[in-house]
Amino acid sequence: MTQAVMLQGTASDVGKSVLAAGLCRIFYQDGLRTAPFKSQNMALNSGITSDGKEMGRAQIFQAEAAGITPDVRMNPVLLKPTSDRQAQVVLMGKVATNMDAVSYHDYKPRLREQILAVYNSLAQEYDVIVLEGAGSPAEINLRDRDIVNMGMAEMAQCPVILVADIDRGGVFAAIYGTLALLHKQERDRVKGVIINKFRGDVALLYSGIEQIESLTGVPVLGVMPWLDVDLEDEDGVALQNDKYRGNAPRDITIAIVQLPHISNFTDFNALAAQPDVRIRYIRRPEALTDADLVILPGSKNTLSDLAWLRESGMADALLQTHRQGVPVMGICGGYQMLGDTIVDEVESGLGTQPGLGLLNTITRFAQDKITTQVNATMSGELPSWLAAAAGLPVRGYEIHMGETVLQEGCCTAMTLQKNGCSVADGAVTADGLAFGTYLHGLFDSDAFTRAVVNGLRARKGLAPWETTFCYAEHKARQFDLLAEAMRQHIDIDKIYTIMQQHQEPV
C-alpha cells in the first residue's frame, strides 16, 4: 500500500512547500519512488508540463526534488487570481472558467470525486505521496466544503503534520489555536508538529515545547532553523522578505517591477542566483535610479497593472529611465505592456488601450490560452547588450492568451520550435534598449543568462565573467542542503513510523 503524509500549516507562508520539497528529497535519497500532491493551489506562479498542462510552480519544484518529471496530476486544481474577487480556474492543466469566491465555494463539492480519482491514480505509481495543504486547516468558515486541508487528508486517509512559523511570533498560540479549532476526528489525524524558521538558541524553546505537547497531546517532531537555501517561493507575500530586497552589493543591479498582479516571479530565480547580480523588486519610481536593467514581469491582469504603472508614477519613471539609456525588458504581460497598443475584449473588457510605446507592437487578447514548453534560438543578430546572446539556444514555456504582432522598427527576438514549425517570438528595437518575449523560464538557460549579464557588465566597463553558472546544479545542491538540514533537525525516523502506522486504505 502506498504510504502518504500531509503537511498542513498554521497559516500561509509558514514553509509548507519547502518542507514538502525536503521530504520529497529525503524519500528520493532513501530510494523511494516519491511524488508531491496538492489538490488545490492558489498561486500566480505556474509552469507547464511536457504535455502542455499548467500547474503550480510549488509542485513542479517538489517533483524536481523527488527526481521525477512534473505531472499535472500532482496539482489538479489551480486557482489564478485575476482580481481581488475573481480567479481563473484551471482544472487538470486547462482553463475551465473564471469564478468569484462564492461561486467557487459552491462548486468545490463537485471536484471531490475528480480529485480523489486523480490522487488514487498517482498513488498507484509511487511508494510515497507527500501532500501539501493550503493556508490553514482552521479556516472554520470553509470547513464544510474543504478539498485541500483536512478534507483532502480524509480523502487520502493519511496522517497530518502541522507546520508552524516561529519567525512571525506567537508560534505556541498558533499551534494550540489551530488544533483547538479542529473537530476531534480532524485533530486525531495530526500526528506531529514542526516548528519552522527558528533563529537563535533552540534551548530557549524546550520548556514551551514541553508545555504545548502536554496541552495538545501532539509531539513536536523538530525545530527547523531559518535556512539560507535558495529555493522557489510560491506566494507573492514572499516578495516582502529580505531575500528579495536586494541589499547585497553586486556588480549588476536588475530592477523588477512588482506589479499588483505579478505572475511567475520564479522566472528570475536563476538570474538572482548569478554571483554578480543583485535583484530588486520595486514599487516606487525613485527605486529605478541605480538599475542597469529594468524588467516588467508577467501579469495576470495586464491592463489593470498597466493602469497601476501610470497611476503610481512608475510608467513615467520607467520611460525616463529608458530615455537615459537603461534597457527595459518585458516578459509575457510585461512584453504586452511595452507595446503601442493592447486590444482586450477578454481579460478585462477594457477594449483598446495604449501601451508604453517602447516597442512598435500590437497585442490582441484571445479566448484560448497557449500553454506549451518550447525550445528556441535567439536571433542571429542582436544589438547592444544582447549581442553576445545572438544565436544561442534557449528553453522555456509559454502561458498567455494573446498574440503580439510586430510593426515597423521592431525585429524578432527569437525563433521557437513548435510542432515541427519555426515560429517567431518577441521583439527588440534597433538600439536594443527595449526587448520583449512571451517566453517564461528564459533565464534558466545558463549560456543565455551569462551572455546577457556580461552584456550589462560591458555597458558599465566591467570585464566579462568567463565562467557560466549552472542553475540546475545549483538547485540540486539546494535540495540536498535542505534534506541534510531536515535530517539534522527533524525526527525523520518518527515520520516514517507515522506513515507506516497511520496510513489507512483509501
From Swiss-Prot:
Pfam families: CbiA, GATase_3. The active site is at 332 (nucleophile), 440. Disulfide bonds: none annotated. SUPFAM superfamilies: Class I glutamine amidotransferase-like, P-loop containing nucleoside triphosphate hydrolases. Keywords: Cobalamin biosynthesis, Glutamine amidotransferase. Pathway: Cofactor biosynthesis; adenosylcobalamin biosynthesis. GO terms for molecular function: ABC-type vitamin B12 transporter activity; catalytic activity. One of its GO terms (biological process) is cobalamin biosynthetic process. It comes from the Bacteria. Residues 251-448 form the GATase cobBQ-type domain. Catalyzes amidations at positions B, D, E, and G on adenosylcobyrinic A,C-diamide. NH(2) groups are provided by glutamine, and one molecule of ATP is hydrogenolyzed for each amidation. Belongs to the CobB/CobQ family. CobQ subfamily. NCBIfam families: cobQ, PRK00784.1. This is Cobyric acid synthase.
